């Protein structure tokens, strides 16, 4: 039987609060400065320093601005680190707007195909409701970027620079999602009336293409790659296609890279491959697929790749115990237990099961600090510009990584034969709303 809060209980709560006058100091500070500023731990700031025993040289950070393209920025940053080192470039970037254009067009097609497939289900079914909740968005995962690269290649940022709507995507997303939901109404009716949907869908995609061209620009079919390297030598490669550019200058075989996740919930055994139903961007593209491993395995592969001079794409819950001004991510960064007198004690698995944590953001791991063969902190390249953190770079304690990192992408050479074989097996399909299907923004 449900019970309401009584006035006797309220009096008891108030009395208990008044019995601890030491809390008044914290109360005054919190009410004036906010929870994070009032409880920031100076010991954490002093120990989580931006100094690392192993570090990959990288240039200034990029800036996704007011968009949710972190997963895209992070992946393209791993590519540009390799490219900049090979060609001797400084602060060169690949076009995030180019991949963004194709991602949105392909997500529109992916959504419309799913609407056609589910047209005979009720509008309020959980699956249809999930599809309609967000027809498309900025967010994504590693395998979505792989699909884009394999189909469309990449271009330099100068060949397709940022626009107002690529950097501030809210209005574009609102308009595009309104268009797609309208199209969903039409397609569902057409299926029920046994009308042709292929022609309708093509007309709809033509309208989406027009919308994207008007807001993001039209992607180049060929472009001129001209630059000066760090020795001031002029180089040029004229009329190169985006796929030729990727093959010639980046040339990473993305099929050799394996997404590892750490999801310690009862329904996800370790050393098992997983996928997520209805998650993707390109129809018949690279399927979403991960290998669930223990955290020690994930971190060792990550550290080994960094020690060999290659950065690592990773996905985490960036908002948890993170101080963005200083760029510190640490389980002890805030004195919350001391301030409020109670402790939140959920495990990583419980936070996933009870919707308190999931992958929300993708960044790049560029350094690791190892003392007496033990890792104690990691260097993180964010994509929020240079005004936060240490010129845009963050530092994550190893304890924070354990609790709030959910995915990394590493070369298969850093994994055992048994793990590579496990990844090659048929994956278990997770429901679309599983926390491992969340998108990095």
Swiss-Prot record:
GO terms for cellular component: cytoplasm. One of its GO terms (biological process) is proteolysis. The active site is at residues 70, 361, 382. PROSITE patterns: THIOL_PROTEASE_CYS, THIOL_PROTEASE_HIS. It catalyses: Inactivates bleomycin B2 (a cytotoxic glycometallopeptide) by hydrolysis of a carboxyamide bond of beta-aminoalanine, but also shows general aminopeptidase activity. The specificity varies somewhat with source, but amino acid arylamides of Met, Leu and Ala are preferred. One of its GO terms (molecular function) is cysteine-type endopeptidase activity. The keyword Manganese does not apply. It comes from the Bacteria. It is an enzyme of class 3 (hydrolase). Its EC number is 3.4.22.40. Keywords: Aminopeptidase, Hydrolase, Protease, Thiol protease. The keyword Protease applies. PANTHER family: BLEOMYCIN HYDROLASE. Belongs to the peptidase C1 family. This is Aminopeptidase C. It comes from Listeria innocua serovar 6a (strain ATCC BAA-680 / CLIP 11262).
